[in-house]
Structure formats: C-alpha cells, structure tokens
Design a protein with these regions (language model features):
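A compositional/structural signature for long, glycine/proline-rich flexible linkers
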Residues: 2-367
Length: 367
C-alpha cells in the first residue's frame, strides 16, 4: 500500500494505522494459505490446491513453516480452491486422545467442525466444503457426505492436529498410517466424473507480512475482497470495507496481474479517493512492523488478556485479539482445544537467538 499526492486531506498516521490493523488478518492469512498451497520451498506445502500433506515426524525447533508448531501433535493439511466445484474430504477414525479439524480462509476466523472433545473421529467422516460462489452447487445433499461446511472464502485451509502417542510405538505407527487415509477430491471426482476445468488465476505475490504491506498490500486486499464473503451486519467486515474503500479497494473490482513482478506493483487504474506512492508503502511497512512488535509483547506477557479470545469463529472475535493473533502467528486452536501462554525469560529480556533457553515443567505442571 503507499502518502497521498492528489487528495487534499491525505493519509495521516491514524488513518494508515487503522488500515493496517483492519487488513492484518487478511494479509497474514493470505501469506499463510498461499504458502502452504503454492510455495515450493515450504517443506509442508501440499503442492497445489485440493491436495493434502501429512507430516511424518513431530515438529522441533528447526520447523519454520508454522509459527509456534506443536511438538506433541502431527498435522495433516488440506488446501482448498472452492471456486469451480465443492471439495469432498474423507477423514478416517483415529486411535488418539486428541484430534481436531481446524478450518479458516483469508479472513482468519477459525472454526473447529470436528474434534475428539466433541466425540468425533471415533468413526470415519466425509465432509463437503463449498462457498456462496462455488459454481454449480446449490447446497443440495450428496450421497455419502456426512457433514457440510460453508466457507467464507474461495481459498481456504482445513487441517488436522493429531496427537500420535509417540511414546507408544505401535499406536504411533497406526496413527501415521491413518493420516495417509485423508483424501481430497472435487465433487465431480467424488461422483466418478472428470474434474471440472477451473479458470487459471494469477495470485498477487505473497511473502512476509511487512513486505506485502509495503509493496503489494493493496493488490492482495483487492484479491482477498474478490474471494471473500462479507456480512452486511458484521461490524468487523464493514469496518475493513470502509477502511480500504478510499484506496479504491472494493469487492468485485477486476484487475489484471499479468505483469506483476515479485512483490511489485502491476499497472492498475485504481478508482481511489487517495493516491498512494512509494513513500506510503514504506510507512505502511513501519506501522505493520510496529504492530507486530506490540502484538508479540502482548502475546508473551504473563498478563496477556487475550488467551481465551483468540482463534474464534466469525461473530465471536473482536479487533484487538484478531490483530494480535494475526501479527504473532496466524492459525491456532481456540482455548477449548489448546492454550498458547507466552513464556518469558527470568530476567525479563527478549529471547535472543545467540542464547540457548531451557523451559522446565514438572510432571505435575503438565496439562
């Protein structure tokens, strides 16, 4: 995104901070979802849409693909493109004390449609994913489908967390084999028909949040707006639409990304009240980096007020915890599934990669 030249009022710091705060959830999740679907350098990438990736070993400190990776659960990721056809995913039964299915789209609202805490995963389950824009599907029931999940975005993630019981070798082996039984098919494929052709699409460049805010934020937000369902009665939805409208970003506006360089700016004639230039991009970056630092301080504080307010469904989130969860590390389980308390140092200083740190918990302190 970028101070205004042609608008007499311009963009002040307060306006820009509001734009960044309202946009953060979308840009963060755009980067996450597209990385897991499209980034060939992401070791956990599915290698495309409507495909799955199953981990084969528990995460450790070397894992960089996920912010705050759990080291006691394994992941099975499914990245969804719901534009041309619904996607049907088969989930097997697991021999595990904890399994949860988490879904989210570019808007970063989190749903847990299945979990062992709700009695799920005792038997196989087939789920159909779709959106209001999915072509050729009107919500009609499909034989063999157990559950239907309407997503808020055309591009989305659905992934499992599985406690594999690593201390029990046979149980671990069984769960690793079961993870490979998760399959994703378009509805046409599920019904034994050829897959429908899907319109090829060029995504605005994804990467680090600060880079996108500086060089491509407006293009990413326009893309996101075109592929997200907004609720006219939802305060946060309407606030982000209002914040971006002066920049010319509105749902349904077409633009051509054919000549966009990596994290650069294609030539687009924005119908904007405020014109942006390169200096604005740098300012957006500074604000985004400051918000990320503020959010990390909140997250790591023993007095973090948002432990029970993050990773919730639409309608149950407020802006402050949404910004914090998006800036610190997108995608997580709500408090009834997992907790994310911050861990600080004994001297109160920030952790430094030059040092080693030891975290000790007694057996009685473990959950």
């Amino acid at each position: 995104m970028s101070s205004s030249k042609n608008n007499p009022t311009g963009l002040n710091t307060e306006n820009m901070r509001n734009i960044v705060r309202r946009s953060y959830q979308y840009i963060a999740m755009y980067n996450v979802i597209n990385s897991f679907a499209l980034d060939e350098y992401n070791p956990m990438s599915t290698g495309g849409w409507n495909k799955t990736y199953a981990m084969t070993a528990l995460a450790d400190h070397t894992v960089r693909a996920i912010a705050r990776p759990n080291n006691d659960t394994l992941y099975v990721l499914t990245m969804l493109d719901l534009r041309g056809d619904p996607v049907v995913v088969h989930y097997p039964a697991f021999d595990s004390k904890f399994v949860s299915l988490e879904t989210s789209a570019y808007d970063h609202y989190v749903d847990i449609p299945l979990s062992t805490t709700k009695g799920d995963f005792k038997k196989p389950m087939t789920m159909l994913y779709y959106t209001d824009r999915t072509q050729g599907y009107d919500g009609a029931p499909v034989e063999g489908v157990d559950k239907y999940m309407k997503m808020s975005g055309d591009f989305a993630s659905a992934f499992l967390r599985i406690m594999p019981h690593a201390a029990e070798p046979e149980r671990l082996k069984k769960n690793l084999a079961t993870m490979k039984e998760v399959t994703a098919k378009t509805l046409s494929e599920y019904l034994g028909k050829p897959a429908k052709p899907v319109e090829k699409i060029r995504f605005p460049a994804f990467g680090r949040d600060a880079d996108v805010f500086e060089k491509g934020g407006r293009y990413v937000m326009q893309f996101v707006f075109n592929h997200t369902t907004f609720d006219p009665n939802d305060e946060m939805d309407q606030a982000v639409l209002a914040a971006l409208k002066p920049l010319g970003v509105e749902p349904g506006q077409y633009f051509n990304l054919a000549n966009q360089p990596a994290l650069g700016s294609p030539t687009i004639q924005w119908k904007a009240e405020i014109e942006l230039d390169e200096s604005d991009g740098k300012k957006f970056r500074e604000i985004a980096e400051k918000i990320a630092q503020e959010s990390l301080a909140i997250w790591n504080s023993p007095d973090n007020p948002y432990l029970f307010d993050v990773f919730k469904p639409k309608g149950k989130m407020t802006l402050e915890p949404m910004v914090v969860q998006s800036a610190v590390g997108p995608i997580g389980n709500p408090a009834d599934q997992a907790m994310y308390p911050g861990i600080g140092t004994t001297d109160g200083k920030s952790m430094n990669a030059l040092n080693d740190y030891v975290i000790r918990m007694s057996k009685d302190q473990l959950p």
